[in-house]
Amino acid sequence: LNYRRKHKVGVDVEIDSLQKYLYDNIVCKWNLDDFNGYGRVYKNKRNKLIIPEYYVSEKEYKEVLLDDRLNGIMFFSTSNFAKTYGTLLVQDVDIIFTFNLSSLQFCEEREDEYIRQYIYSLMNQYSSKQEVKQITTGLNNVYSDYNGVADYFFDMQDFHHFKITTEIRYFNKNCI
């Protein structure tokens, strides 16, 4: 499923467009029936952990961490600040991906590099409103903004975690 925001403003407008583009291309390319995409998530504190959670409804959030019954997940995590240039805002956004490589039918070997390069090529074909800055691998590195999360997962052979950090440019549209 592709979980998209109903009411979009600011960075969420650009995230939603990129989310739809990536989700549609990933699902179509690999014929995935169990891939979940989420828009911007929140860094919510649960016990002593910082957990990525997607807003569902008033006071209700859905944890978006790995579910081993799925082919994979992706979600968007924004930096805690945006640079401003008049009405233009520039913000770093991490797109976090986890793929269950054993569930992907095209994988005869560990195709982690192939998956990263395909998604990187999608990003480079996308709008000029974003620019890829970095690709990060390794469970601890990917979930570095989420304190304690990596301790509960193993960076096992079947799962590939990576994030793409992109700079998104958007305009402040009057919301009043």
PLM feature spans:
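Small/polar-rich, solvent-exposed N-terminal microdomains that initiate assembly or binding
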Residues: 1-85
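C-terminal interaction module
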Residues: 7, 174-176
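Extended low-complexity, serine/threonine- and proline-enriched intrinsically disordered segments
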Residues: 14, 18-27, 93, 112-122
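Acidic-leaning, charged glycine-interspersed low-complexity segments
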Residues: 34, 39, 112-169
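Oligomerization/assembly interface segments of phage tail-like spikes and tubes
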Residues: 85-103, 157-172
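Short histidine-centered catalytic/ligand-binding loop motif
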Residues: 102-115
